[in-house]
Amino acid sequence: MQYPLPIARLIDNYMKLPGIGEKTATRLAFYTMDMPEQDVEDFSKSLMQVKENLHSCSICGNITESDPCEICRDSNRDRSTIMVVEQPKDVMAFEEMGEYNGLYHVLHGVLSPMDGVGPEEINIKSLITRLQKQDEVKEVILALNSSPEGEATAMYLAKLIKPAGLKVTRLAAGLAVGSDIEYANSITLKRAVQGRTDL
């Protein structure tokens, strides 16, 4: 038996989300159908608002409602340090930790030649331009996930940045190989930042 078209479409759309298979998508679709109409309306509005009201900061690439973002505008941040991360969710993880007070730069990915992702496909050019313009920057912390792609991206960035005379550091060991920063607890992140090593 085939599902009615609206349910089938909803299942297909849920399956576009990472980690959602057909069974989970079907369960979510039927749950959505049983939700009060106001909740469904609020849910759909919040989805649209994310797309309509959020964009990338023109300086750091983090998600923001205003440009530049709140972190880039904050005059109390330590402007001598820029932490390079893969995704906006990594910024959130370090901000929740509450120990880092520098600036960020979000790459929106990592180098992955097998997937057709080269330096032009991620936010590297804007990082180099930013470092050339901002004289107060003394250290660049490469806080990339400890995956093979993250490691390769860190080495590539270090080769680009070090000739400019800037200190380039990497998070200390402590994050399991292949683990994502967003899932690390605050204590692990704090130790990784405090114990960072030169590249």
From Swiss-Prot:
<dbReference type="Pfam" id="PF02132">
    <property type="entry name" value="RecR_ZnF"/>
</dbReference>
<keyword id="KW-0227">DNA damage</keyword>
<dbReference type="Pfam" id="PF21176">
    <property type="entry name" value="RecR_HhH"/>
</dbReference>
<dbReference type="GO" id="GO:0006281">
    <property type="term" value="P:DNA repair"/>
</dbReference>
<keyword id="KW-0863">Zinc-finger</keyword>
<dbReference type="GO" id="GO:0006310">
    <property type="term" value="P:DNA recombination"/>
</dbReference>
<feature type="domain" description="Toprim">
    <location>
        <begin position="80"/>
        <end position="176"/>
    </location>
</feature>
<dbReference type="InterPro" id="IPR023627">
    <property type="entry name" value="Rcmb_RecR"/>
</dbReference>
<dbReference type="InterPro" id="IPR000093">
    <property type="entry name" value="DNA_Rcmb_RecR"/>
</dbReference>
<comment type="similarity">
    <text>Belongs to the RecR family.</text>
</comment>
<keyword id="KW-0233">DNA recombination</keyword>
<keyword id="KW-0479">Metal-binding</keyword>
<dbReference type="Pfam" id="PF21175">
    <property type="entry name" value="RecR_C"/>
</dbReference>
<dbReference type="InterPro" id="IPR034137">
    <property type="entry name" value="TOPRIM_RecR"/>
</dbReference>
<dbReference type="InterPro" id="IPR006171">
    <property type="entry name" value="TOPRIM_dom"/>
</dbReference>
<keyword id="KW-0862">Zinc</keyword>
<dbReference type="Pfam" id="PF13662">
    <property type="entry name" value="Toprim_4"/>
</dbReference>
<dbReference type="InterPro" id="IPR015967">
    <property type="entry name" value="Rcmb_RecR_Znf"/>
</dbReference>
<dbReference type="GO" id="GO:0008270">
    <property type="term" value="F:zinc ion binding"/>
</dbReference>
<comment type="function">
    <text>May play a role in DNA repair. It seems to be involved in an RecBC-independent recombinational process of DNA repair. It may act with RecF and RecO.</text>
</comment>
<feature type="zinc finger region" description="C4-type">
    <location>
        <begin position="57"/>
        <end position="72"/>
    </location>
</feature>
<dbReference type="GO" id="GO:0003677">
    <property type="term" value="F:DNA binding"/>
</dbReference>
<protein>
    <recommendedName>
        <fullName>Recombination protein RecR</fullName>
    </recommendedName>
</protein>
<keyword id="KW-0234">DNA repair</keyword>
